[in-house]
Swiss-Prot record:
Keyword Secreted: yes
Gene3D superfamilies associated with the record: Insulin-like
Name this polypeptide is given: Bombyxin B-2 homolog
Highest taxon of the lineage: Eukaryota
Length: 91
């Protein structure tokens, strides 16, 4: 409970500070947490490193979420700067 409250406070601080500055970079856990906060209706995505995928000797195809692909959000918001409006377009 305390951890989730801390994460929510941090995300709110990030959102407020981003709104004043415009575009910024979101990478890794910050990107995932920000998308989870902005898009609560999105389903949880399970990691493909789990035991149920270990039996397959091939790479499973990338899942495409929403109108834009998951890799696109990394390209747009981690490698380059993006705004919260761009992040919201991935919901």
């Amino acid at each position: 409970m305390k951890v989730s409250m801390f994460v929510m406070i941090v995300l709110c601080m990030v959102a407020v500070s981003s709104a004043g500055r415009g575009a910024r970079r979101y990478c890794g856990r910050v990107l995932a947490d920000t998308l989870a906060y902005l898009c609560p209706e999105m389903e949880e995505v399970e990691k493909r490193s789990g035991a149920q995928y270990a039996r397959y000797g091939w790479q499973l195809p990338e899942s495409r979420e929403g109108a834009r692909g998951k890799r696109g959000v990394v390209d747009e918001c981690c490698y380059n700067s993006c705004t919260l409006d761009v992040l919201l377009s991935y919901c």
